[in-house]
Amino acid sequence: MAKQGKTPNEAFGGDARSGPGISSLPRQLGSLVTILDEVRSGTSRTRPELIASTGLSRAVVAQRSAELCASGLVEEAELGASTGGRAPRILRFRSESGYLLAAELGATSITVALTDLSAGIVDIHEEPSDISAGPHVILERVKALFDELLERHRDRPGQLWGVGIGLPGPVEFSSGRAVAPPIMLGWDQFPVREAFASRYGAPVWVDNDVNVLALGEVRAGVGRGHDLVVFVKLGTGIGAGIVVNGHILRGAQGCAGDVGHIRVTDDPTAVCRCGKIGCLEELAGGRALGRRGEAAARQGASRILGEVLAAKGSIDAEDVAHASHQGDPVALELITDAGSLVGGVLASLVNFVNPSLIVIGGGVARAGDGLLATIRQTLYARSLPLATRDLLVQRSALDGTGGVIGVASMVADELFAPHTLNAWLDAGHPGVLSRLDRVESRA
């Protein structure tokens, strides 16, 4: 474990004042960040490609790329392909220059990771948890897991540049605080960002878990190459994250995509944990599947679910999914009903934002092909033909890593955004951001 009072930068063998020497660079941040983004993403890998993709002049590209190389953020690598004349050098983002800590908190699990500056996973750990235990218990556990990651990699070169947290509820991104989260008792307005910034000497960003899952899918999953992606998490709750041109669409306050609380019935008995009536999450979320499956088992309607109930005393969504895989008609009906409700809500979303890809993830998404088929069938039946002509609906393939990849990607994007880069240029290291009262974040 890292010693108390010792910053992660010291644990990594660094000093908060050291790092890339970009404090001496001129303040033409627009072109500098444009080139850095192109190189970071791999969109452009040589100076001729940068000139073609950005529209910047040869002189500006030469100067900014030289400054980035001098800073240590970018380096010249092997020769690229020649298009006539001398072959250009490939420019490579030095993702090993620093490290990021990322945590995805779900309703029933914690996943933490140490990554490089390109969100490449260096080390990862997942364990069961219960978000209802409250922020003090959960965040202390996250800190302990972070400390273990840092201790295991204390001899690696580089410094900690940022920390990111994904929470399973509405998050006001500008403040980094959950706001009236339905399943997170005690988390409302809790200062999550401050709890980590003072401990780790690095800037901290907090976002909704579905937003970062969506970003992770775009950066490392089936969403690569798509301009408008909707990620739908079907877990204990239901939510959607929207990524447009590589950036999370958060809305004015950060709650864009909260489809789990769209009303799908007027039944007064369908009271959601948010306090409202008839929410999608109350009827089609993991908690609802478990509740309905247990009711069926107690009524003797399902032999398979009845055996599970007798063995463990309760039924959850995973049990319903397993029963559906075995052909249990009751479980299959429950899965089909949930898929129809989800597909109906997504049809409205498709008509509204016209995505090219919808990715289905979360624990309930592992219920099998029947769920995905029902979602597709309902969605296509209720959406406009033009909106679905080229639409793909696929299951996530990231298998538990998408959240932390998305968290780390979000942190890296914020670190190298113009407004943030400008705030730490003079210090030469982003650790200075942890001492600022507030870092303006993109909504």
Q: How does the language model describe each region?
A:
Residues 76-77, 203-208, 242:
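General beta-strand structural signal in soluble alpha/beta enzymes
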Residues 116, 173, 243:
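Short, acidic, Ser/Thr-enriched surface-loop or helix-capping motifs
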Residues 121, 178, 248-249:
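Hydrophobic "anchor" residues
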Residues 124-228, 370-381:
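Glycine-rich phosphate-binding loop and adjoining helix at the ATP-binding site
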Residues 209, 235, 407:
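Active-site glycine-centered loops adjacent to acidic/histidine catalytic or metal-binding residues
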